[in-house]
């Protein structure tokens, strides 16, 4: 299966009605992540061959709880499993040696 990959995508928790995020949007650059398999982040690929936003309804759309598997926050920030979140993966890269993978909040979240 082949997919057309956008150069970048902007992820915004502002999409959730009634929620005011504390941090700004995140623009994800696919080019910097081309050595990572799509299904590493888009876990529905092997089953449905569709690529949806991480915050699609029914996937990671829980904005109230930070620890639930459906949590928007956990999806991007957990450090318990380096293969399951942005921060976890970036932290693992830094642990392995010099890396320019961002870890500071404002490195990804633009106000």
UniProtKB/Swiss-Prot annotation:
Heme c 2 binds at residues 43, 54, 59-60. GO terms for cellular component: periplasmic space. The keyword Metal-binding applies. Its main location: periplasm. Binds 4 heme c groups covalently per monomer. It holds the Pfam family Cytochrom_CIII. GO terms for biological process: anaerobic respiration. GO terms for molecular function: electron transfer activity; heme binding; metal ion binding. Heme c 4 binds at residues 77, 105, 108-109. Heme c 1 binds at residues 30, 38, 41-42. The second heme binding site has an unusual CXXXXCH motif. This is Cytochrome c3, 26 kDa. It comes from Desulfomicrobium norvegicum (strain DSM 1741 / NCIMB 8310) (Desulfovibrio baculatus (strain Norway 4)).
